């Protein structure tokens, strides 16, 4: 997968936007959640293989790291909740698309997981 193909895939999600808040080296994909821009994907703009960081359920994150050499702890991110995926071809396209959607859904549904105090 090329960077333009990955960008197209990420920007197809509803209300997703591309930003560069950390400089030109990192493309950050965000979605509006109740008026706040929340990150769901980051892509390193330089180097090969492409590095894609995605939010992930903590238990699934560990399973993916154990199963795939190309799935690492999130680079410069909360390692419990983020994975960095090296796009080497080890993951099938449909699995990669599923992980992107999983990340996006975790971000937009996050308020449903916040504990409430009564």
Locate predicted features.
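Charge-dense, helix-prone N-terminal extensions
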Residues: 1-118
